[in-house]
Regions:
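An alpha-helical support segment within catalytic cores of ATP-dependent transferases
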Residues: 61-108, 118-119, 124
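ATP-binding pocket architecture of kinase catalytic cores
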Residues: 1-69, 83, 100
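Alpha-helical elements of Rossmann-like donor-binding domains used by nucleotide-donor carbohydrate transfer enzymes
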Residues: 51-58, 91, 142, 161
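Activation of the activation-loop gatekeeper triad in protein kinase-fold domains
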Residues: 127-131
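Conserved protein-kinase catalytic-loop position immediately C-terminal to the HRD catalytic Asp
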Residues: 113-114
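An acidic site on a long C-lobe helix of protein kinase domains
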Residues: 48, 136-139
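Active-site activation/catalytic loop segments of kinase-like enzymes and analogous catalytic loops
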Residues: 140-166
Length: 166
């Protein structure tokens, strides 16, 4: 479904089950993850972050009407949270419903470990298992949180660049 958006993504070879869990088998992408490149060359973090943000914005510029809606996916996840009582789940669902209805492609797990830097420097995004259509700000918020868990400086750099460029 995401292929319909016209993004340059690895070819899906197979959908299969491994240890009774669903798995996507994609064509092999030669290179290193952007995360590895950033760790090896921290002096150029700003340059790599700019390329990373530009890549995410290219994704957000696309639409794919056949993708699952982000709000539907989040509503399902909220409803499955048994750690919360019904009132708490209801309050979250009301807040979710107030989110703007957008149809932008959202990767759902966009972080430097899911970007392969090819030998020619070309960036390729992998791990499209969580892709949806919805509010790009929610996708960016998830990316920010993933950065913040590992590196607060990188998280702030990401957020600043994303806000300036979007």
């Amino acid at each position: 479904r995401v292929e319909e958006a016209g993004l340059d993504i690895p070819k899906l070879d197979e959908v299969t089950q491994i240890d009774e869990k669903w798995a996507l088998v994609i064509e092999c992408q030669a290179g290193e993850t952007l995360e590895t490149v950033m760790e090896k060359d921290p002096d150029n973090l700003e340059k790599y972050m700019a390329e990373f943000v530009d890549l995410q914005l290219q994704i957000h510029a696309k639409t794919a009407p056949m993708l699952t809606k982000l709000k539907d996916k989040l509503a399902k996840q909220i409803n499955q949270l048994k750690e919360l009582d019904a009132t708490q789940r209801y309050e979250l669902l009301v807040r979710l419903e107030s989110m703007p209805k957008h149809t932008k492609v959202c990767h759902g797990d966009f972080n430097p470990s899911n970007v392969i830097v090819g030998e020619d420097g070309k960036l390729t995004v992998v791990d499209w298992a969580h892709v949806t259509q919805g509010n790009a700000s929610a996708d960016a918020a998830l990316t920010y949180l993933q950065f913040a868990l590992k590196n607060r400086v990188a998280a702030e750099m990401y957020l600043t660049m994303f806000c300036k460029k979007s």
